[in-house]
Structure formats: C-alpha cells, structure tokens
C-alpha cells in the first residue's frame, strides 16, 4: 500500500504541469502528504484548517513521502518536531514554517488556487523556497548532518526509553533521504510501514485512540443538563487541568485549602492560555474572557 501510494504521489510531484493543493479543513496524515506532493500549497485561514503528520501518535510513520518532502520544504530542524511529535499547526503558522506557500480567506480557496495554477503555468508565479536556517544549511553537509541526527536520536531515546519504534524509523527514513536521495528515502518508508502497522505497539495505540474517542461520546440514556458553573475541589495537577479545559465552556470555581496550590494552579492555567494564544488556537481577547471566568478560593 505504501509503495503504491508513494508511486502515485511521485507522479504528481514530477508532473510537467503545475499541481496546486487547496487546503480547507483538516489535512492530517495522508491528506498533508498529498498536498506536499503538489507544486504549490494554499491553505485557508479558517479555524478548522489544521495540518500535521500525527501517525507517530499511533505508532506509525508517515508512509506517503512526508519524511522526505516535509524535510525538503522546511528543512531538518523544522520537519523533525512535526514528524516526531505529531504536532498539528494552523494555516498561518504553517505559512511561517514554510509548509504552505500562501494563506487565503475560506471563501476564496478554490478561486485563488485556480489563479495560482494559471500563474505557475505561464511563469508569472514561482514558488519561493523557504529560507533555511544556518543549521539546516549545515545539515546538508555530511559531518554536521550526522551531529544533528545523532542529537535527535539521543533525544528520542531519552523520551521513549526505547519502547516506541516509530520515531526511530522516522529518523532513519529522514537520514536515508538526506544521504541517498528522495527515491531511497521513499523506499525506506515503505519497508518500515508494514512491520509497524501490524506491530503490538501500533495496535495498542490505535486501540487506545478509539477507546478515548468512545469515552468522549455522551451517554445514550438520560437528558443532559446545561452546566452554568463548574466547581473543582483541589487545585493540584488534575484539578488545574480540569479547570483549564473547562474555562471555555462555563465559569469555573477552584477551591483548595492551600494558597500555594491555588497560586500554582493559576500559573498553570495562565501558561496554558498563553500557549493557546501563541499557537493561534484562540485570540488574546478570548484568552482574557476565559481567564475572567476563573475563580480561585479557599
């Protein structure tokens, strides 16, 4: 399956006519890999538009060329965090990273993509490659490339303790592509995909993914009642986490006997809101609104 998919996407990548990807909504996993095979990528700035390679979270590796084309687009240091963590990014951040070439309004995606395709065809538009960092440029050379990948392997080993094979496989595919070219890297992807897909680690992570999604579904019996105010007893790790994820839904009161615990919870919640603002998940105004709904008391 991986070999056939890679062969098809390589036909897109090497097509003599320009192919433009118009992304509106989620482009995750194979969806992003199709876009990466195109010559130009547009994305809408709709809140629902997210891009990423989450396969590693299921014990798999991207098997449609992302270990090669994402590195080609954004460089090693930009691609590895996305490939090794499954991080998802919104359209504007994807533009800054170099994953997409342009961002447009939700209503203008198709029209803008058509204009881009025509401009690429007549030569009036050329894709501007991302300006690589000094480290990424150095990573193209054998001695420093080895150091970058060695550091990445050591970090993966510390974080996974050798229990998850997918991140190691991803690094090997990236290294193969850098050393021997995209064709060899794609072949390496396909070699790894089968054993990972049927391995116990991936099967367990896939089961857990489905179980967590099932647990999020509402109970079939009984009528849900609106939550006007949520009370949380205890401002520890669990309590502050519950408060943080609930602030967007209703006012939250956190109660704890220790002032120190309440102060720590406030810092944790504030940092969580700042991260959401930085990742453009919510606006600064929305973060302030949610923070105003939080009450800490003894």
Predicted regions and their residues:
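Long amphipathic alpha-helix in the N-terminal Rossmann-like dinucleotide-binding domain
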Residues: 1, 118, 192-203
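Glycine-rich adenosine-cofactor-binding loop
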Residues: 222-248
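Glycine-rich beta-to-alpha active-site loop
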Residues: 6, 12-58, 62-63, 234-237, ...
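Short beta-strand element of Class I
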Residues: 251-253
């Amino acid at each position: 399956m991986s070999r056939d998919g890679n062969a098809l996407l390589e036909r897109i990548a090497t097509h003599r006519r320009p192919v433009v990807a118009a992304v509106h909504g989620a482009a995750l996993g194979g969806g992003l890999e199709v876009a990466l095979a195109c010559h130009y990528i547009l994305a809408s700035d709709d809140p629902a538009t997210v891009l990423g390679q989450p396969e590693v979270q299921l014990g798999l590796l991207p098997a449609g060329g992302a270990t090669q084309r994402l590195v080609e687009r954004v460089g090693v240091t930009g691609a590895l965090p996305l490939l090794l963590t499954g991080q998802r990014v919104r359209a504007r951040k994807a533009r800054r990273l170099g994953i997409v070439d342009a961002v447009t309004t939700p209503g203008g995606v198709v029209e803008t993509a058509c204009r881009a395709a025509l401009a690429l065809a007549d030569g009036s538009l050329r894709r501007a490659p991302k300006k690589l960092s000094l480290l990424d440029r150095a990573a193209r050379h054998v001695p420093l490339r080895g150091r970058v990948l060695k550091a990445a392997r050591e970090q993966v080993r510390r974080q996974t303790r050798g229990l998850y094979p997918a991140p190691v496989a991803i690094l090997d595919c990236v290294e193969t592509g850098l050393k021997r070219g995209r064709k060899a890297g794609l072949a390496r992807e396909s070699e790894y995909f089968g054993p990972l897909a049927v391995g116990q680690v991936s099967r367990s992570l896939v089961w857990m993914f489905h179980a967590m999604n099932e647990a999020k579904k509402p109970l079939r019996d009984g009528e849900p009642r609106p939550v006007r105010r949520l009370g949380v007893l205890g401002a520890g790790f669990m309590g502050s986490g519950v408060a943080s994820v609930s602030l967007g839904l209703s006012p939250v009161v956190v109660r704890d006997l220790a002032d120190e615990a309440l102060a720590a919870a406030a810092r944790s919640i504030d940092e969580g809101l700042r991260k959401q603002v930085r990742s453009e998940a919510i606006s600064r105004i929305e973060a302030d609104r949610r923070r105003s709904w939080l009450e800490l008391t003894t």
